[in-house]
């Protein structure tokens, strides 16, 4: 396109220029409408993954407590609906190795299971609250209205936990009144996300000194860990979380613990690897049940919607 004025129209001698003003006004009006629509959309949904593509899941009840051994071989786990294969956290393409998760519950506990395909199972970190994300791991985030909990585990069964509170709600949601959330304690520091730093709710306060009371976990390796002379099938991880220990998440909106039939919680299920599928595959090294469109797990609005049903698992 040339650099001529948009309003210039060539005419024959004696003719009036045809509708340049109207054309300009029409074009400006269309542009303003388009800009307004895009602005409204951005204000309505300011997150990097479409709202209509967020995963949904129904968690059903188990009739008896589960033994936490990491094997996931009890009847309830065999009957539980598993997630789809985890997809790339950023792009949404399938991960090179299969990863799935499932959720069960009863009156006392929330149960989460992971099935992790890994041909060469590896782990190095053995000290609790080590940076497990530097190993191949699986992760769970559980969000309340004004806070969320992060959990990570590697193939050794070493765990990492953090509790995050949205700073704007620290006072209004009564966290400031609780000694366990004293901001002067060791291990407390500000946090503003990883790859998505424009979150509309702003920064969080992270409690790296916080442990979820009564948490029980186990892993089972189907192969030989840290021995690449053979090929492994992978590993499984199993979590049991007391409902009463999620009270800090439930506090701001007084949600029921255990949940009532039809209640919804937001949870994120992911896997992070120290390896990637070779190009041209677009493998970020992080896979999730519900992708985020950006390298950041800390976006509760993009967590899987988990609805709790009082229906017993396996009855449908």
Describe each PLM feature range.
Residues 26-39:
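Bacterial N-terminal signal peptides
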Residues 13-15, 31, 278:
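N-terminal compositionally biased or targeting/leader segments
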Residues 10-27:
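Bacterial N-terminal signal peptides that target proteins for export
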Residues 2-5:
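Serine residues within intrinsically disordered or low-complexity segments
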